[in-house]
Structures are given as C-alpha cells and as structure tokens.
Amino acid sequence: GIAIAIEFHPAEEIAGDYVDVIECPNGDILFCVADVVGHGIHAAMGSSVLKALLLAVDIVDLSPSAMLDWINQRFCSASLPEDFATMMLLRLSADRKRLVYASAGHELGYLRHADGKIQELNSTGMVLGISNDAEFDDIEYQLYLDDFVVLLSDGVSETFDSSRTILGRDKVVSVIRDPAHSEANGMASEIISVASKHRCESPALDDMTVLIVNITHQAEVSVQPVQRSSILA
C-alpha cells in the first residue's frame, strides 16, 4: 500500500499552486504538483486552467511526458504570453513498485530510500507556456518498502525571513533525510513547520505545497482536516 500526505498553504486566499491525486482505471495513481508564476487571482486562474487540462488529458494511455506535451500545447494557446507554470507529473504503478515522472521546469522532488539514500527528481523539460514545441522526458525508478517520494512547490525552499535570507533546499533535504520521520504525515508537517519558523512573522510571499508518498504495508484510508492524508492499497 501507500500513505499519502498533502500540506497546502496558499500565500493568499486563492492560490497559484495546484496539487492533485488521481486514481487511474488501471490501478495506477497519478500525482500532480503545479505552480503558476506569481500568486493571487491571476495565478489562481492559471491554476484552474491547468486543473481542467489535467482532468481532460488521457491519463491511462499517455506517459507523464506525453501528458505534459498535451497540456503544454493547450496551455500555450489558452494563456497570455507572460503566463508560465511548472508542473511535475508522477505515475505510480498499480503494484506500487515503479514510478515514472516528468517535470516541466518544476522544483526538485526527492526519492528517499529505506537505507537513507536520497535521489533528486530533476526537471525533464522547460516550463509550461513558453513554446508549443517544448519536449519532455520520462524518468523511471523502482520503489521498495519504506521508500518516500517528496514533491514540493518552490515556495517552500524559497521562503524568506525578515532579513531576506532564503530557507534553501538544504534545510528541506535535512528534514527528508532525518530517519525520525518514518511517516508521511510527520515529514510533510515538519517541512512546513521548518519553513514557517524560518519566515517567523514575515508575510508569506508564495504558496507552499508538499506532497509525500510512502510505500507501506497498510491498505486503509484515513482523512485529516488540515492536511489531506490517506493510505491507499
């Protein structure tokens, strides 16, 4: 099974970040984290366009890279010239042993193995909205029991304090690496806690999104009110 934890903290009442988990008819699960440039009303409109496109794309027969290509072409047509967005799509196989992902200029993701080794999930193509001819690649990893997959928006690592000092990715990775975080919920909430403490009383300048997937033995479902959390077979 898998445990899923989501932390979603918009900088304003409406957000430019978009996060989703979609169960495919064949048993695969598709994870999406997207970030429209900016925040507020304009970014939220772009986020709504991306959501509509993701719900319209063929999630069964297309690979993550092919889905990004399809979405990018339509986002280029539907958005203004200055509208850009990043997106990471990750497909988890029905047997929960394989992931395939593609990233359109999105913030680094991370794969933490049970032995503590961490691999970066890098971008595999340019951001959405720049060119109809953009190309994207798929990258595949094998998954094992107790592995963690961590997807974020850049609002987490780019959190600033009152002196304009950035949090940075190293602080985020230190949380992911910490063996004390053996559950998706705890890891996700700690990442947000570290970013919030760094910001202190400074205003939030960007949305913060964290999505964590943990490969487990469990096959139950639970939902919590503040962060969306579930365990799927």
Give the role of each language-model region:
Residues 64-76, 172, 184-196:
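Short, well-structured alpha-helical segments that form the helix of a local strand-helix-strand
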Residues 62, 80-81, 162, 181, ...:
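Alpha-helix boundary/capping and short turn/kink residues
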Residues 165-180:
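Divalent-cation-assisted or electrostatically stabilized phosphate/pyrophosphate-binding catalytic cores
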Residues 157:
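Catalytic/regulatory signature loops of cyclic-dinucleotide turnover enzymes
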